Amino acid sequence: MLLKNIKYIVALIFIFYQTSIYSKSTSLEKFDGNNFSKYFSGIVALENRNNSDALDFFDSSKSLIDKHDPYFKKYISSLILENEILKAINLIKYNKSKKIINFFEAYLLLSIDSIKRNELDNANEYLEIAFSFIDNDTINTAILETFKQYIFVFKENKILDNQKNFGNLSLISKTFQKCFLNDSRTDAHFVNLINDNEADFSRYIFFYTSYLIEN
């Protein structure tokens, strides 16, 4: 049950996170010509949202991992956008002792991995580190606060009081939290979500159907 809910959470967060992952390119240091060309092409492809091409270029210039810190962050971003989450997590864990993982996405993924392993205290610790990299970014703040709420639900089997309100994300999140807890009002929350007149939440009919089948 926990693993299934993690899949829902990751899918939910991915929808919101995709809108904020593209960033301006960082100044380039001197590399050998071949790696420079591939790295630069990867940056251009990523900023043009050609995610598959970007990942190919970054894959072919992995020797830059220990030479240029911004490369690793862009490589991880391209993996996320291509839904290669497990590969991104494994790369981050492998390079965990290095300074190159000092960015928001790295600790968010480490937290997700810890939740999947039911290591909830570790997940909280990684979230606290991730908070130091949000730079007043509203979307990243919403993502981290939402994950904190889920971790609390998994640990305490109840919903956190005085949750911060992030609009539609909070509405969706609270519905899934009630679903996890088998709350008697889950049906009503799904119905309200699907029938919301201010936004199209029809994609959540699938989750509601799955909930009805399981119950």
Which ranges hold each PLM region?
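Residue-level signature for tetratricopeptide repeat
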Residues: 44, 77-78, 113, 151-152, ...
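Classical Sec-dependent N-terminal signal peptides that target proteins to the secretory pathway
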Residues: 2-25
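Internal alpha-helical scaffold/solenoid segments in large eukaryotic proteins
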Residues: 51-52, 56, 202-208
